């Protein structure tokens, strides 16, 4: 079975040299630089390394895990070593998810270029593969792993070992019968196409075959009309035309004769079901499909907390990599904590902690470079400034000189605005959020309203500094603060704050009477949640005309996250997350912003944009129309083995479905577990949910490995907005804990949404 990459591997000069192997230094820090021998494996999909040229090698990384390749000049670590290592000989391998970058130093510029070109070629090839090509490559990878003696053939003993690796528990006699049927050459081994036939027999899906035959008159093919009937009746694509059905046949039918006859074979039908058209996520929601001309405060905005940190909040590393990763995943609001640094250069770090420091100008340069690589819509720099007057001037100079035309330094067209501009009007602009001087303030310093230093850095009990003082006590505190020696706000920096002036929140009434649409308040998660419970409707109305930013509790020193859904329910636009930390909360955030082109802006439902809205997230009442969701969890495909330390174990998978939305809609149900089958488990169970406010609901599908002795192990998940869900027979392609695709791992479900009557709290 020839690999899809075989042509390139045998003809491309760079790939040929990479297969021979080269020595390179692996760089982790200024003091850790080790010589290693790296070699591209013959499958073209994995790179191994060894301590010595002919020493025992082990896997270093898979090409499918690589996001991009950067040259040495773009590496924060390699730049710090520029005096001892030539940057032209270095390069960085950036991985998907949260895996640390791999910095390498070649022996020459030419060798570095060979690896950079070769790796980028392989990454581009993998990225451009369609479903069938990915499946073929996946099969090729498994064949390579199963063929222990690398002779291009697989004995039955090797096949048995491979089945175990693939999570298949199968009767030996049945496995041998499949093996013999595939061994058409009768050589006692499987080669190339014989292994493909063995795999097809192994993965024959009775549930899909049954579905296919229920719509096919002859059980062999679906005619154009039969396929159209399936799309309209089962897939609930009522507006589907025969032209669209024909387009799908042309796209997924593998045989030319089938395309000419306008029919879909069983293979074509399965290919359609496994494609993006058969995915649970509606393809119509993937591009930018929402109105982007409304004021900024009408959108949920993907936001990051302490963006510079790639670890915990007390001792973690500060790095520009945090900004690169946040911006490339579509984040549109990043945080910058700035303090006085040596030699007059401001630095960014988590004040009063042991976190490392990076230069403010490096952060600004990174934002300038990466701000609009993923999305053209505006980026907000949330400044927390703790600098002296002089270093504030330096900050203003860096922002102006480095960002140039990208920086919004005046109102649009110089006109006095009456509302916030829209994302469309602010395309490719960077906005500064921070404190701003006014004539009334007469250059007096106003205490930063958000993220009190005690809460963030000294970890006093949260309640001590999140309890709002009485007005009289507040005034005394403010006077006392002004007596202390504090840096005065520099006019040059103040003038760069155009639409996003930070102000202290006192009450919703006070905001209505004294504040303007271009001002923004920040809330700790605890305070925001309390306000939702005590005055949920007022909070919703507040967020229809002014922006709110919510940040994690200072007690989350491990960089854990809160559930953003609770804050979105009240219309809070900027719910800042610790993006370096994977988990349920980030799954919800990623799933929410997967829609609308992943541009980082999602239009809020109309009832969260109406200033007269009566909506209360804790008490949703009519006119919201409830919906009932029926999910038949049918089967799973090629689920990975999660805990490789459990020798000889095969997963016992179960599926958990979670709903996140308003409190009354939050629910979870799960299937039974299937014993010893991660390859093609079958559940056939139906779960039922009733949701009052579908516009705010998120669905999370989680596959777990059941363990009666301890906690179930996580296998994979997929999270999406209710409004982006397709009905009918759909595949859910699973993601890892880090959000990386686990293809071809998936679950097969049937989705049915029934409209309910007008719902209330009951």
UniProtKB/Swiss-Prot annotation:
GO BP term, pick one: intracellular signal transduction
Record-annotated active site: 305, 350
Superkingdom of the source species: Eukaryota
UniProt: Ca(2+) 2 binding residues: 183, 185, 187, 189, 194
Enzyme class: hydrolase
An example molecular function term from Gene Ontology annotations: phosphatidylinositol-4,5-bisphosphate phospholipase C activity
UniProt: Ca(2+) 4 binding residues: 650, 652, 676
Comment on protein domains: The PDZ-binding motif mediates the interaction with GRIP1.
InterPro entries: C2_dom (IPR000008), C2_domain_sf (IPR035892), EF-hand-dom_pair (IPR011992), EF_Hand_1_Ca_BS (IPR018247), EF_hand_dom (IPR002048), PH-like_dom_sf (IPR011993), PH_domain (IPR001849), PI-PLC_fam (IPR001192)
All residue ranges annotated as the C2 domain in the record: 609-736
Listed name of the protein: 1-phosphatidylinositol 4,5-bisphosphate phosphodiesterase delta-4
UniProt-annotated binding residues for Ca(2+) 1: 147, 149, 151, 153, 158
Domain PI-PLC X-box, chain residue ranges per copy: 290-435
GBA, short sequence motif: residues: 213-243
Tissue: Highly expressed in skeletal muscle and kidney tissues, and at moderate level in intestinal tissue. Expressed in corneal epithelial cells.
Quaternary data: Interacts with GRIP1.
UniProt organism field: Homo sapiens (Human)
PH domain ranges (all copies): 16-124
Motif (PDZ-binding): 731-734
Subcellular localization: Membrane; Nucleus; Cytoplasm; Endoplasmic reticulum
The entry's keywords: Calcium, Cytoplasm, Endoplasmic reticulum, Guanine-nucleotide releasing factor, Hydrolase, Lipid degradation, Lipid metabolism, Membrane, Metal-binding, Nucleus, Phosphoprotein, Repeat, Transducer
PI-PLC Y-box domain span: 493-609
Residues reported to bind substrate: 433, 435, 522, 549
Classification via Pfam families: C2, EF-hand_5, EF-hand_like, PH, PI-PLC-X, PI-PLC-Y
Residues annotated to bind Ca(2+) 5: 705-707
Major localization class: membrane
């Amino acid at each position: 079975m020839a690999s899809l990459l075989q042509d390139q591997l045998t003809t491309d000069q760079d790939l040929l040299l990479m297969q021979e192997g080269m020595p390179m230094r692996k760089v982790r820090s200024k003091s850790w630089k080790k010589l290693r021998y790296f070699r591209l494996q013959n499958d073209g999909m994995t790179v191994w390394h060894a301590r010595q040229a002919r020493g025992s090698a082990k896997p270093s990384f898979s090409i499918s895990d690589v996001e991009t390749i950067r040259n040495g000049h773009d590496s924060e670590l390699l730049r710090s070593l520029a005096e001892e290592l030539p940057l032209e000989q270095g390069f960085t391998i950036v991985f998907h998810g949260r895996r640390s970058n791999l910095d390498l130093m070649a022996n020459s510029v030419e060798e570095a270029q060979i690896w950079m070109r070769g790796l980028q070629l392989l990454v581009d090839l993998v990225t451009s593969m369609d479903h069938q090509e990915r499946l073929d490559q996946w099969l090729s990878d498994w064949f390579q792993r199963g063929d222990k003696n690398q002779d291009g053939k697989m004995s039955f003993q090797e096949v048995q070992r491979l089945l175990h690796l693939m999570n298949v528990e199968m009767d030996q006699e049945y496995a041998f019968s499949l093996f013999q049927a595939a061994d058409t050459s009768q050589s006692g081994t499987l080669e190339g196409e014989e292994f493909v036939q063995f795999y097809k027999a192994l993965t024959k899906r009775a549930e899909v075959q049954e579905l296919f035959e229920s719509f096919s008159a002859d059980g062999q093919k679906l005619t154009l009309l039969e396929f159209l009937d399936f799309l309209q009746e089962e897939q609930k694509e009522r507006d589907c035309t025969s032209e669209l059905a024909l387009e799908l046949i042309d796209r997924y039918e593998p045989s030319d004769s089938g395309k000419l006859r306008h029919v879909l074979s069983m293979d074509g039908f399965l290919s359609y079901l496994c494609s993006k058209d058969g995915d649970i996520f509606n393809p119509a929601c993937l591009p930018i499909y929402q109105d982007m001309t409304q004021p900024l405060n009408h959108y949920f905005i993907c936001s990051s907390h302490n963006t510079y940190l790639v670890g915990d909040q007390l001792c973690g590393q500060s790095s520009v990599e945090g900004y690169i990763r946040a911006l490339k995943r579509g984040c549109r609001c990043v945080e910058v904590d700035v303090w006085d640094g040596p030699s007059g250069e401001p630095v960014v770090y988590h004040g009063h902690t042991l976190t490392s420091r990076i230069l403010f100008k490096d952060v600004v340069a990174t934002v300038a470079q990466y701000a609009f690589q993923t999305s053209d819509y505006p980026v907000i720099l949330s400044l927390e400034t703790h600098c002296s007057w002089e270093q504030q001037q330096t900050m203003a100079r860096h922002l102006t000189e480095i960002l140039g035309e990208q920086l919004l330094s005046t109102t649009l067209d110089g006109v006095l605005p009456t509302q916030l501009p829209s994302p469309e009007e602010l395309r490719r602009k960077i906005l500064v959020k921070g404190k701003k001087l006014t004539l009334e303030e007469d250059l007096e310093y106003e205490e930063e309203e958000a993220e009190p230093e005690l809460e963030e850095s000294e970890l006093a009990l949260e309640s001590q500094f999140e309890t709002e003082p009485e007005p009289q006590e507040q005034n005394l505190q403010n006077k006392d603060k002004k007596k202390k020696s504090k840096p005065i706000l520099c006019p040059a920096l103040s003038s760069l704050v155009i639409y996003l002036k930070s102000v202290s929140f006192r009450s919703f009434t006070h905001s209505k009477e004294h504040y303007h649409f271009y001002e923004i308040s920040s809330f700790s998660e605890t305070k925001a949640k309390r306000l939702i419970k005590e005055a949920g409707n007022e909070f919703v109305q507040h967020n229809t005309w002014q922006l709110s930013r919510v940040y994690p509790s200072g007690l989350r020193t491990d960089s854990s996250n809160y559930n953003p859904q609770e804050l979105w329910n009240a219309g809070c636009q900027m719910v800042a997350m610790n993006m370096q930390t994977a988990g349920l909360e980030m799954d919800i955030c990623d799933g929410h912003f997967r829609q609308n082109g992943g541009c980082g802006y999602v239009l809020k439902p109309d009832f969260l944009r109406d200033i007269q809205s009566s909506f209360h997230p804790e008490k949703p009442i009519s006119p919201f129309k409830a919906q009932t969701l029926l999910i038949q969890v049918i089967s799973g495909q090629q689920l990975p083995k999660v805990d490789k330390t459990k020798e000889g174990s095969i997963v016992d998978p179960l599926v958990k479905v979670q709903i996140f939305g308003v409190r009354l809609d939050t629910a979870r149900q799960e299937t039974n577990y299937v014993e010893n089958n991660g390859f093609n488990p079958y559940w056939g169970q139906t779960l039922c949910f009733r949701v009052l406010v579908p516009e705010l609901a998120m669905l999370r599908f989680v596959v777990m490995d059941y363990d009666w002795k301890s906690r179930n192990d996580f296998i994979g998940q997929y999270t999406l907005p209710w409004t982006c869900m397709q009905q009918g027979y759909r595949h859910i392609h699973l993601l890892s804990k880090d959000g990386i695709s686990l293809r071809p791992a998936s679950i097969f479900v049937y989705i049915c949404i029934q409209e309910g009557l007008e719902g209330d709290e009951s």
